[in-house]
Amino acid sequence: MTLTLAKPLPKDAEYLADVAAKIGSAEGVSPYLLLGICYAESNFGAALKPKGPSGSGDFIARPCTPDRDKRMKEAPLPGVERKVLPEGIKARKLAGPVEAWVPTTTGWGCGLLQFDYEAHFDFCKSGQWKEPAIIFRSACGLLKQSRKSLQKMLPTLDGAALDRATIASYNAGAGRVAKFIKDGKSLDDCTFHPGYVDKICNKADEFAGYSGSWMWGA
């Protein structure tokens, strides 16, 4: 299946247009939205280490906890080392000293669509995320599940507002998004990267050549 793009993908990522078209069509999710998420999460793999579908991101240390220690014992990430950080973890606003898991060669974010190793432990430890079609399909499943959860928690939310909240949930989780909306806060306050939703929507529209390409089923 061929996807027409108003703005071309980078040369080494052109194959992702067909992946997004095939998976998006089968799952009922806009392929332009999928490409927008891929851009925001990994710059189509260019921001990963190593570059490409098998690369990882998010190299910020995480403090040791019983659950985290258990996961790392069951399926350790290569190059993630347990260390005492005298100065703490500034990115997480944790003062030192703190015992933490510190990524060196492998990060917590898996693949083109950056599934978190801990939040999606079974999927990530399987290694299936390295296959573009599989991680795109899994992203569709996550988006659809987040949308259903938001509809239950916020039954009056619909249209573009529901679509944007669904996109925010990909980054922050449906529960967190619903709480922020109930508290009258913006999606920018909720996501862990400023402008996350707009970045995805704008990029999706660039690829499509029209506004609203990211809306559900567009």
Residue ranges and their predicted role:
Residues 3-27, 71-218:
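Non-catalytic cell-wall polysaccharide-engagement segments
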Residues 29-79, 83, 87-88, 100:
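Secreted/periplasmic proteins that engage bacterial cell-wall peptidoglycan
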